A protein has these predicted regions:
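Nucleotide and nucleotide-moiety/phosphate-recognizing core
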Residues: 1-148, 156-172, 179-180, 184-189
């Protein structure tokens, strides 16, 4: 695959986390820095979709949502609208265990015909760890304008590819949404 841009969706204050999710500390550093570390071997072309200045300490391009308060689809719309590459790695900011190896697998298995490629286990699809084509910008705009913001509904409207992984491989894809989940993660890793 030609050059890729990685966009990390820094969605703002989480009601369950009580703070900016990407800046929550895990093993001594913010989630966002764990994600950057996983992305850098893949591409140095990293941008953040964020409406806050809290990420300004990191030397990457930041972009505010073009259409506010539209959840992950709004962030993906902003990313793809601003992207200069056809294919883009879209990641949420709450996946501190993501690895370069898994991202490389996603890219290696991506079929160029698919406009979205994501991982899935038997029990769960991971739409916010994926490769998204710039070609779907107008379709995203359409669903945003209609306030159809559910990621799974959107996925069903687009030619997409699911890369199956075993439940046992699911752990690095875990997204951390609450203090309890963070505590569980710390316990599981200790």
């Amino acid at each position: 695959m030609e050059t890729l841009t990685a966009f990390i969706l820094c969605g703002g204050k989480s009601s369950r986390m009580k703070s900016e999710k990407g800046l929550v500390l895990f093993q001594g550093k913010p989630f966002i820095e764990h994600i950057i570390q996983a992305v850098l071997p893949i591409t140095g072309n990293i941008e953040f979709i964020t409406n806050t200045k809290e990420y300004d300490y990191l030397p990457y391009q930041k972009r505010a949502d073009i259409v506010k308060d539209k959840g992950p689809l709004g962030g993906i719309y902003t990313a793809l609208t601003n992207s200069e590459t056809e294919f883009n790695l879209i990641l949420s900011c709450d996946i501190p265990l993501i690895s370069s190896e898994l991202l490389a697998e996603l890219i290696a298995k991506h079929n160029q015909e698919a406009q979205i490629t994501v991982f899935a286990t038997e029990s769960r699809i991971h739409p916010l760890i994926g490769i998204y084509s710039k070609k779907i910008v107008s379709l995203i705009r359409e669903v945003i304008d209609n306030n159809e913001l559910k990621m799974m509904d959107f996925l069903s409207k687009v030619p997409h590819q699911i890369i199956k992984i075993e439940e046992s491989e699911n752990f690095p894809l875990t997204n951390i949404n609450s203090v309890d989940e963070l505590n569980d993660l710390n316990i599981n890793l200790s």
